[in-house]
From Swiss-Prot:
Taxonomic source organism: Mus musculus
Database matches in InterPro entries: ASPM, IQ_motif_EF-hand-BS, P-loop_NTPase
Keywords for the protein's UniProt record, in alphabetical order: Calmodulin-binding, Cytoplasm, Repeat
Record localization: Cytoplasm
Name the UniProt record assigns to this protein: Spermatogenesis-associated protein 17
Amino acid sequence: METNSNNFGELQELKDMATLAKLLARAPFLESQYYFRNRAVDSFRKFENDAAVMIQSWFRGCQVRAYMRHLNRVVTIIQKWWRSYLGRKFYQLVVEAAYYTMKMNLYNEMAVRIQRRWRGFRIRKYCFNYYYLKEYLRAVSETNDAIREALEEFAEMKEREERKVLLEREEKQKDYQARKMHYLLSTKQISGIYNSPFREHPDPWELRLQKAKPLGHQKYTAEKGKTSQSPSNWLACTSVHSFPQSESLPPISRKRCQGPFRDINEVLEQRYKPLEPTLRVAEPINHLRLAREAFKQEERMRNVQDKMFLPFSSYHKKEKYIPMIHSSSAYNSDSYGQKHFRSQDSKKWISDKDFQTVLPSFQLFSKYGKLYSKAGEIV
């Protein structure tokens, strides 16, 4: 077995050597063939490369365009589904908002209806009750009538009291005048001025003078002299409410209180003496404003009208200025109302004499010493 394997190995080596010898013999031919083949291939290599590049670019372009179409188709589908989802979601929101709005409108309408019914019931029952208002107005009218009647009665009573007071005052004045004119009373020798023989009945003043008592002048002057020293003269300057006003009472004859007391007149004079402010206190605080107002008032008194240039202003161009008849004429202002109040036309005079001013005589003075009753008798 070992011999066979060795023989096979030798044969194989021989074959390899024979093959190598053949290849070595054909080496120059292979080189020339390789050269010519590569030279022929180089002449077509650029054309084939350009063709291959063109084929590859076209193929790749087809692939890219197909992929872009696929992407566009897929993106369109995705956008369609997404937009439909957003549309459905927005539509659901709109529908929900519309539903809530419809419910709120319905609820508001129902609430308004309920409030209207309730407010109407409440107003009719508590605020504007027709029967209650009718009764109230009837009571008010009755109260007004009663108050009006009471006021009318009170006004009549006040009027009667005022008339009574006026009559009493007039009677007192007449009595006082009669006491003052008591010396005009008729005597046995000389008749008074109120006793005329030409009258059927005597003058009422004659009877009043007879009933009146003469006024005591000496006593009055003495009382007046006494009162001049009293605090009434300096109390006259005080206000009405500063010292109590009361009717005069008769003096009380009593002794002066013992002790170091001042005279009551002196005390009252010191208490109720008028205020004597200084110049600073007497001057008002708003004297500037008062001075301005006084100055404006003087200016208004001087001016004939507030708008001085009213007839010549452009604002009143459309209005026609109408001058006064008595203060304007063709040339000069008329003197009527300024110098005289009677028209003078010498051509219409009947005579050259002016009007004669004659005053009527007093009948009472003209009858002095002529028409009196004899011996003071009342006719």
